Amino acid sequence: NNDVTLHPLWLATLIETAERKGADFATGKILQAGNSTLIDGTFDEISRGACAFRCGSGKPDSPFWNQPRRIRIAPMTAALFRRRLFHDIGKLDEHFISYMEDTDFGLRCSIAGRSGVYVPSAVARHMGSATLGAWSSDTVRSIARNQVLLAAKHFQGQPRWPIVAGQLLWGLLAFRHARGFAYLSGKFAGRRAARAMIRPAVGDVDKVGVVVSDSEKEIFEVQRQTGFDIYWSAYAWLVPR
């Protein structure tokens, strides 16, 4: 992103680790530019509710976030990808325009058996939604729209209740921030745009189910280690595993 500042050794650190681990992509610890004691993001996960989770976002930096690990999805805020990955997996899906295109790409990678690494010693600082604003109408509309696209593209044949619960809970957050109209307009826009989406191959349905279930387990493990957010507490109550 153009609102990111990289540590001088960021690139060298990611290249060295990715080469050593044989990873297809790599990302580091991203701190908030305005308060370097808070995490902006680390790695991403996706729930059975078709809602993406940026692990660590808004949490205090702590030893938990200093643990390197294998990851499914790298936030494209600041990440490194092997060129051949785009040849094998495909380019970013331009239907998403902005927001969650990295989630879609990471999910495609994971379905294909590709993975990356989180390297906390590679540090970046991010302004965070500097273009639109974290809860601006445009941001909420874009995310609400793209949640529909993600579900239409990858969640065909998956259990319906987690999707309904996850989307409604996110909508409640939007209403709480006085962005209910933006949320609803985004959902309607998503339904229209989804008609042009390419659906996954039938054989991918089971793979998606496994990947998303494992990813959701990781979300709850992160929540247990760092403290539950209101959204995930409510989601866990509505959608027991």
Where are the regions a protein language model picked out?
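The conserved acidic donor/metal-binding loop of glycosyltransferases
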Residues: 1-5, 95
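Conserved donor NDP-sugar-binding/catalytic core segment of glycosyltransferases
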Residues: 4-51
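A short, conserved alpha-helix in the catalytic core of glycosyltransferases
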Residues: 14, 72-123
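A recurrent flexible, glycine/aromatic-enriched loop bordering the glycosyltransferase active site
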Residues: 39, 48-53, 59-84, 103-105
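Active-site-adjacent helix/loop segment of glycosyltransferases
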Residues: 116-219, 228, 232
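A hydrophobic membrane-anchoring alpha-helix module
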Residues: 231-241
